């Protein structure tokens, strides 16, 4: 036993291992970050495979909301957090967890497959190169893929992509990861590649038209059991249909092409969050409709920015930044909205909670801290 442990903790750890695991498996994983601070023994137990095997046997699955942040003090390092609510508090906060030991000035593409979070590609700033003709920085693209096991919050390296990609777009469908764009000289052979998470192998998805891949920056999402890809430059969206690409609903394209991480799909309904409101896509009317019933949710003013959304147990989880000019600080807010489909075809939302979960002080006005918000299902 470690020096200074409470007698009650000592007595608990003296129990047979199978009984200890049985007890810990019944505790919500949201409390694990706090429990891991008790002692090294607790940290070992909470990270052990035996604990997760016990949780599987007990049928204990949870969906946890993860937030990735890039701090102004170290803008190339990605920091990962989990949203946590203490046992004696109603306030929710971001609790830091293990972050991968690599830097990326250009953001990777992020996806979730089961209990694993993938960070795909990205790039380091090319400090030896001059600013390009558009006034933008240039980057050294990466082909690497990092994966976090959300059961233990440990990172591993997955097989690299065949092509290095900077600011790639990624989405998942049926356990396969579709990665689009992010490299120079795109053509019908390298425009998109697919990672099979079961076989851990990459393959290119050839497309029939060079016209589709003339852009450089793409956005993608899985919706209606297929993959949608939008091009910023061409202002057009394509969808895959029976192995072929064709133009998608133009109304859909105009609604989501600003930022794919501000959009999510919940029970086959497309939602997006932006300055002003939360909207869902009405397939019958082929238009975006405001999500009604959000009493209590603050009005999104010009000081709110960088919206992210995720499906959290069938509820809409929203994260955003607020810059507070008088204090020269940036706050990260999170909210959770319950969704209700009504008989007349309308969709309403009920705000369950919203909270200021993180504050960063310093010259952040022109720096986006919030990188992404993702939900992973774990045992």
From Swiss-Prot:
It comes from the Eukaryota. CDD domains: F-box_AtAFR-like. Gene3D superfamilies: Kelch-type beta propeller. Residues 9-55 form the F-box domain. Kelch repeats lie at residues 116-175, 176-222, 262-308. Keywords: Kelch repeat, Repeat. The keyword Aminoacyl-tRNA synthetase does not apply. PANTHER family: F-BOX/KELCH-REPEAT PROTEIN SKIP4, GALACTOSE OXIDASE_KELCH REPEAT SUPERFAMILY PROTEIN. This is F-box/kelch-repeat protein At4g33900. It comes from Arabidopsis thaliana (Mouse-ear cress).
